[in-house]
Amino acid sequence: MASEVRGLRKTKIGVVVSSKMDKTVVVRVERIYSHPQYAKVVRDSRKFYAHDGLGVSEGDKVKIQETRPLSKLKRWRVVERVS
């Protein structure tokens, strides 16, 4: 029991839409999928609050990773900038 293996944490890639808070950014992650019944390509987006330790700015494309709850809304952290 001393050496338990933890599962891989989820990662997502998105664009920073707001960096006005101190050490927190809002990242919009887009998802494109085909509707199962109508076969139309649908574009959907979600916003995630993430801890910013790198000092990213609005418009940057970043990779975020799941983490422990850091505040009421923050459950993700910025891992790296993606070019």
Curated annotation (Swiss-Prot):
SUPFAM superfamilies referenced in this protein's UniProt entry, alphabetically: Nucleic acid-binding proteins
Subunit structure: Part of the 30S ribosomal subunit.
CC terms in the record's Gene Ontology section: cytosolic small ribosomal subunit
Protein name, per record: Small ribosomal subunit protein uS17
Family note: Belongs to the universal ribosomal protein uS17 family.
Assigned keywords, A-Z: Ribonucleoprotein, Ribosomal protein, RNA-binding, rRNA-binding
Pfam families hit by this protein: Ribosomal_S17
Record flagged with keyword Cell cycle: no
Biological process terms in GO annotation: translation
GO terms of molecular function: rRNA binding; structural constituent of ribosome
HAMAP family: Ribosomal_uS17_B (MF_01345_B)
Coiled coil: none
InterPro entries per record: NA-bd_OB-fold, Ribosomal_uS17, Ribosomal_uS17_bact/chlr, Ribosomal_uS17_CS
Function per UniProt: One of the primary rRNA binding proteins, it binds specifically to the 5'-end of 16S ribosomal RNA.
